């Protein structure tokens, strides 16, 4: 309030409900299985880089086009550099996407009812109307309902694959069928933050569907959540629009050191493949053991599982485990309150959690 008792905040800000991130506690040491961080350190090549990096480079502005990093990403996916955009984490990229492609003048944005909870925040921020489409009883996406949108036009569609927080993935055929039926003048955004843990990527479809944009991140599979680096793949038209959006906010979004670390990370394919395989093995081990203890475990292609046990609330599970020094994610949302989301750590982490769950519940 100012001296006259008037609010100094915009009406837009006063109407916002911000995203609530997962806990990053400092009060004690926890086994952190709540924010889908990779349990392994990044590629050792990155440690070597940091030891040798010349800090004098940091007095210079970074390449605003991130050309070298984009070239390396393009080579990895066998696409052109004009198909690649990079930003400070996929969250920033998704914010640009919402601004660049979704306009309430053409209808509501469509996304699943239970999904990444930043989506409605972006909609409120940019004043984009939206429709949440309920999941099917088995927690899979109802693609038919997403396409139909209640018989109304939509300004676009967005969903994670695998979905979060369920971990359930669509097949490539399902995605192709959706794209074949959806209006070609409306952008479809597939958020592939967790695709490397067993899902089928839609990146190979961007040359056939000019309205498809795929968002990826270095946070999960590359163990670089603390770096804040993401990228998107799509048609040159979509990528140009993202650059226009970025340059209207901040031309120099991705720092020099961040770009260099990204280049090194994406080239260490041996490290990447080994760590992904170990996480998948730990996930499958944990899932089967937990089912044996009477838990429902949704089929996951991510680095987490969404689970519940009959007779228990998600809040009870979360609070009891926290007292024991283990953090999982609980969503106080109607329809999924009995579930918790468990990040997959190292196999020994999951074995410890299994023992605690068996003893406590």
UniProtKB/Swiss-Prot annotation:
Keyword Transferase appears in the UniProt entry: yes
GO biological process: L-histidine biosynthetic process
Record PTM N6-(pyridoxal phosphate)lysine, positions in chain: 220
Pfam family, one: Aminotran_1_2
Disulfide topology: none
Family matches, as InterPro entries: Aminotrans_II_pyridoxalP_BS, Aminotransferase_I/II_large, HisP_aminotrans, HistidinolP_aminotransfase, PyrdxlP-dep_Trfase, PyrdxlP-dep_Trfase_major, PyrdxlP-dep_Trfase_small
Pathway participation: Amino-acid biosynthesis; L-histidine biosynthesis; L-histidine from 5-phospho-alpha-D-ribose 1-diphosphate: step 7/9
Gene3D superfamilies cross-referenced by the UniProt entry: Aspartate Aminotransferase, domain 1, Type I PLP-dependent aspartate aminotransferase-like (Major domain)
Enzymatic reactions: L-histidinol phosphate + 2-oxoglutarate = 3-(imidazol-4-yl)-2-oxopropyl phosphate + L-glutamate
EC main group: transferase
Cofactor entry: pyridoxal 5'-phosphate
Alphabetized PROSITE patterns for the sequence: AA_TRANSFER_CLASS_2
E.C. code: 2.6.1.9
Origin superkingdom: Bacteria
Keywords per UniProt: Amino-acid biosynthesis, Aminotransferase, Histidine biosynthesis, Pyridoxal phosphate, Transferase
GO molecular function, one term: pyridoxal phosphate binding
Self-association state and partner proteins as the record states: Homodimer.
Annotated family: Belongs to the class-II pyridoxal-phosphate-dependent aminotransferase family. Histidinol-phosphate aminotransferase subfamily.
Protein name in the entry: Histidinol-phosphate aminotransferase
Species: Syntrophus aciditrophicus (strain SB)
Gene: hisC
């Amino acid at each position: 309030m100012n001296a006259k008792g008037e609010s100094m905040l915009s009406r837009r800000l006063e109407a916002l409900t911000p995203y609530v991130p997962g806990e990053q506690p400092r009060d004690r040491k926890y086994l952190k299985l709540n924010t889908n961080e990779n349990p392994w350190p990044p590629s050792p090549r990155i440690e070597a880089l940091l030891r040798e990096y010349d800090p004098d480079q940091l007095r210079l502005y970074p390449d605003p086009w991130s050309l070298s990093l984009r070239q390396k990403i393009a080579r990895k996916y066998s696409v052109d550099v004009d198909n690649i955009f990079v930003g400070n984490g996929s969250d920033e990229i998704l914010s640009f996407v919402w601004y660049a492609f979704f306009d309430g003048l053409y209808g509501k944005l469509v996304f699943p009812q239970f999904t990444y909870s930043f989506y409605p925040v972006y909609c409120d921020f940019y004043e984009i109307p939206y429709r949440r489409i309920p999941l099917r009883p088995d927690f899979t996406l109802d693609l038919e309902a997403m396409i139909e949108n209640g018989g109304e036009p939509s300004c676009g569609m967005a969903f994670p694959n695998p979905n979060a927080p369920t971990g359930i993935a669509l097949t490539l055929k399902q995605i192709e069928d959706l794209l074949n039926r959806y209006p070609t003048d409306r952008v479809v955004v597939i958020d592939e933050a967790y695709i490397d843990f067993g899902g089928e990527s839609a990146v190979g479809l961007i040359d056939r569907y000019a309205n498809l944009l795929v968002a990826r991140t270095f946070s999960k599979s590359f163990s670089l959540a603390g770096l804040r680096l993401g990228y998107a793949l799509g048609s040159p038209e979509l990528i140009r629009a993202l650059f226009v959006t970025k340059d209207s906010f901040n031309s120099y979004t991705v720092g020099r050191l961040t770009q260099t670390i990204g280049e090194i990370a994406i080239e260490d394919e041996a490290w990447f493949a080994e760590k992904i395989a170990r996480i998948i093995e730990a996930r499958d081990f944990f899932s089967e053991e937990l089912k044996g203890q009477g838990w429902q475990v949704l089929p996951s292609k991510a680095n987490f599982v969404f689970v519940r046990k009959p007779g228990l609330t998600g809040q009870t599970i979360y609070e009891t485990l926290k007292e024991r020094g283990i953090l999982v994610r609980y969503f106080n949302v109607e329809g999924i309150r009995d579930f918790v989301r468990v990040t997959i750590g190292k196999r020994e982490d999951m074995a410890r959690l299994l023992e605690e769950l068996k003893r406590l519940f």
